[in-house]
């Protein structure tokens, strides 16, 4: 990736002209040879993900999609400097999708509006995109008509010049000047016509183009980035022919915002060759698919656990706490942690935990330890007998457990840093580690 980015950086920085000032500026070009490998990688990961999802029932698929949409909404907003409450977003999505057993948190009207836009786009991915619809979505982002304390135009294309700037007053740096407001209607008509066409282009390239094209027109006074990410996701949904969305690019963009804006800026100063942008977009999507794999593994492991434990009588507090840890909360299960998270006394936490030990739901990590910690028993059977060549490896700042399952299936699952650390110290047994991350393999 670095060689491609470096070379295109040198080429694009040589031009100061904004891309929309070129004749026929939307006749975008790209080097198919340089994109071939990354596009094949994305296609392979998409196939693997949907292959795994085939084993999920409808309810589990819905929960997986809800989790993905939660982080899509949260991180797409955070890219623009808007922080949303994750629990409120999750609750709003769960309620709208009819998902039960989700902690109910009253979302604000604003969060409900933002969630409604995302779900509208997901449900109507195969419908024509119109000016009226996209204007309504933009208006939903700004129900008060204000953005950061300033009144803006909502529900309509902008009528003012739009400069993308950074820096303090008096030392502003102009990164991009969008097409004049007189051009916006015509430019958007051209974009919408292309968006609704059946042009035979690789779906990832098409999604990347939509994102870049839309933010380059910058049709609204605010909300353009979030809308661009929604539109690019819609095109991926059309290619998948599914309203079930299990991966999103926003969480990865949020981790690499500076790079995101830098590459957009270079392409917007370029001559129409957007190879660098497409490559970065596809590579970011590839990482997003890895994240989706982790979410699916977590859901499958959780599903496997509850299949085994569904008949065990538990209090609501015990169920809530188990679900919290099953969803990947990064902490040791101790009476102190339990009391803090469940907002109960330490004595109550000790009773809760001991009851779960007696019911074979939890086991002590190190029997007789002075400060005991516990692991969830996903499977009463010792599953280590099914695995060989087990290693814990670190790649790109993440820890992975790698193994061979039943002598034929290679397994690679990302694990929490705390679990990797505890395993290395001997505080976490291999049996518990494999059970936590690989129990889904036992689903018949």
What are these regions (language model features)?
Residues 404-422:
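Acidic, low-complexity, intrinsically disordered interaction modules
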């Amino acid at each position: 990736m670095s060689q491609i980015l470096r070379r295109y950086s040198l080429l694009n920085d040589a031009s100061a002209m904004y891309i929309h000032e070129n004749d026929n500026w939307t006749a975008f070009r790209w080097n198919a040879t340089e994109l071939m490998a990354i596009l094949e990688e994305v296609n392979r990961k998409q196939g693997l993900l949907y292959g795994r999802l085939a084993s999920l029932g409808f309810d589990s698929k819905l929960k997986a999609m809800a989790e993905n949409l939660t982080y899509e909404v949260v991180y797409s907003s955070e890219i623009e400097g808007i922080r949303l409450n994750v629990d409120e977003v999750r609750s709003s999505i769960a309620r709208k999708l009819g998902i039960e057993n989700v902690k109910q948190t009253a979302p604000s009207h604003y969060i409900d509006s933002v969630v409604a836009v995302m779900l509208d786009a997901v449900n109507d991915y195969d419908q024509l995109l119109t000016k009226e619809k996209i204007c309504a979505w933009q208006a939903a982002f700004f129900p008060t008509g204000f953005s950061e304390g300033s009144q803006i135009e909502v529900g309509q294309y902008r009528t003012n010049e739009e400069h993308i700037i950074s820096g303090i007053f008096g030392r502003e740096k102009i990164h991009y000047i969008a097409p004049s407001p007189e051009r916006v209607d015509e430019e958007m008509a051209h974009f919408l016509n292309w968006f609704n066409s059946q042009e035979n282009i690789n779906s990832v390239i098409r999604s990347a183009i939509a994102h870049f094209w839309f933010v380059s027109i910058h049709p609204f006074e605010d909300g353009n980035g979030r809308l661009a990410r929604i539109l690019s996701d819609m095109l991926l949904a059309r290619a998948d022919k599914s309203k079930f969305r299990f991966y999103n690019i926003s969480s990865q963009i949020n981790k690499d915002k500076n790079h995101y804006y830098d590459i957009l800026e270079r392409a917007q100063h370029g001559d129409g060759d957007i190879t660098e942008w497409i490559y970065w977009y596809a590579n970011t999507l590839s990482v997003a698919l890895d994240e989706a794999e982790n979410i699916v593994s977590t859901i499958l492991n959780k599903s496997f656990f509850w299949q085994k434990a569904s008949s065990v009588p538990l209090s609501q507090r015990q169920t809530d706490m188990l679900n919290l840890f099953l969803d990947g909360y990064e902490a040791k299960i101790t009476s102190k942690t339990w009391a803090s998270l469940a907002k109960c006394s330490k004595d109550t936490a000790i009773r809760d935990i001991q009851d779960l030990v007696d019911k074979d739901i939890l086991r002590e990590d190190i029997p007789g330890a002075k400060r005991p910690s516990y692991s969830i028993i996903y499977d009463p059977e010792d599953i280590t007998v099914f695995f060989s060549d087990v290693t814990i490896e670190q790649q790109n700042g993440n820890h992975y457990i790698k193994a061979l399952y039943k002598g034929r299936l290679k397994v690679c699952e990302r694990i929490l840093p705390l679990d990797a650390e505890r395993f290395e110290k001997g505080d976490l047994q291999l049996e518990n580690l494999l059970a936590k991350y690989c129990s889904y393999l036992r689903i018949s």
